[in-house]
Amino acid sequence: MPSGNQEAYDLVSPYLKKIAAKDNNGAPCVSFIGNSGAGHFIKMVHNSIEYGEMQTLAETVHLMKFGLKLSYTEISRTLKSWTNEGLKSYLLEITADILLAKEGKNFLLDQVLDKAGQKGTGSWSLTTALKYNVAYSPLSEAVTARMLSGNKDEREELATFFGHRFGAFGEDKVILIEKIKNAYALTR
């Protein structure tokens, strides 16, 4: 996603095209985007779309693990089946793989602190979307979730105070998994 001076791009584009990813036809995925900063802006928008999908996947896994009481193996198998049902996505595929990752005998996810940081790109993207009257609720929810996750001490204190525990759902698991899949698909 190069941008800036056209003459400079013309000088380096042969090298960029050699190292760039290729599309299904073998053409390099490189094109001049525009003036200074345009490439960064496009990358920011791209990242914000992924940011929203990652949050949706986090919520999907959370609902399946704590609401449906599925194991990581069952969740992984379910997500992999979705990729064969028209929901092909790199993030979906790697999430299914990450769910099975272990360190020793323990699942890696059980060792990860439930606290995410942020550098500001999600907030910048959200501010820009709002400025131009573009609604993208997965991004706004992702930014909010990251803010909340950063307040781990407060979250734990409130959970203790209110005694909140995520209870299992009472409906049929097959029906609920289909509803979760449809909600995930809707956000994409």
Model feature map: region roles:
Residues 1-13, 43-51:
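Short beta-strand and adjoining strand-loop segment in the mid-core
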Residues 16:
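Conserved phosphate-handling catalytic cores of large alpha/beta enzymes
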Residues 21-49, 68-87, 96, 100-116, ...:
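Conserved Rossmann-fold dehydrogenase catalytic segment
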Residues 44, 59, 124-125:
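A general alpha-helix detector
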Residues 54:
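Long, contiguous binding/interaction regions
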Residues 61-65, 127-131:
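Short glycine/serine- and small hydrophobic-enriched flexible loop segments
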Residues 119-130, 136-144, 151-158, 174-177:
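Segments forming oxygen-rich coordination pockets for charged ligands
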